[in-house]
């Protein structure tokens, strides 16, 4: 069985978090679709350090369900994701049907918390006061570099991006598959997800 992933992004999304998610999930046997959240049906986004990426589709044309929806961080990319009504609706439907949803860096606070995707799930995020306050005051602050709470997977930032993507593979395709991908990547000392 082929697992499926939707990796969304916008202008200002973080390059490492986006590319690590796409690459590691593909290595894990996932069929990965990338979607731009930018308006006017744009598929090309300029990421946080200037790299231009063309998405497979614009978020307005997503009409499939996926095993996981992945939201990279970076600013203002996370804010663009939060402003996408289509993405917010997809995430709410994903949670409602018991699907997996994952965010890293700013996105756990800016997207998942601010848009009420989560309720009691514990999350981690980029170490920035406003993001930490949003999770702490909402009772959603977790611990570790990669956190799994229910069907919600979150992580802290660029340095944990590969571990984040491996956690997604592990949660959906199993630990042996994640271990195989980690070995391919020559990761001898990876951060395993912390169950919250």
For each of these PLM feature ranges, what is it?
Residues 1-99, 109-114, 119, 132-143, ...:
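Extended, subdomain-level signal for the structured scaffold at the beginning of enzyme domains
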Residues 104-107:
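Short, thiol/selenol-centered motifs that function as redox-active sites or metal-ligating centers
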Residues 122:
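Short, well-structured active-site flanking segments
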Residues 125:
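Class I SAM-dependent methyltransferase SAM-binding "motif I" and its flanking Rossmann-like core
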Residues 128-129:
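Hydrophobic alpha-helical segments of small multi-pass membrane proteins
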Residues 148:
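Cytochrome P450 catalytic-domain "roof"
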């Amino acid at each position: 069985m082929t697992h499926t992933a939707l990796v969304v992004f916008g202008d200002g999304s973080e390059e490492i978090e986006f590319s690590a998610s796409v690459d590691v999930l593909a290595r894990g046997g996932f069929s990965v679709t990338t979607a731009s959240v930018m308006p006017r049906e744009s598929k090309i986004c300029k990421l946080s350090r200037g790299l231009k990426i063309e998405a497979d589709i614009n978020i307005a044309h997503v009409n499939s369900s996926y095993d996981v929806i992945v939201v990279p961080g970076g600013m203002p990319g996370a804010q663009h994701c939060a402003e996408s009504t289509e993405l917010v609706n997809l995430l709410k439907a994903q949670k409602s049907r018991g699907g997996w949803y994952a965010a890293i860096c700013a996105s756990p606070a800016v997207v998942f918390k601010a848009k009420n995707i989560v309720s009691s799930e514990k999350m981690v995020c980029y170490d920035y006061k406003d993001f930490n306050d949003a999770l702490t005051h909402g009772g959603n602050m977790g611990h570790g570099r990669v956190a799994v709470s229910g069907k919600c997977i979150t992580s802290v930032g660029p340095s944990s991006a590969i571990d984040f993507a491996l956690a997604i593979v592990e949660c959906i395709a199993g630990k042996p598959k994640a271990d195989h991908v980690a070995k391919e990547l020559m990761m001898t000392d990876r951060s395993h997800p912390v169950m919250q």
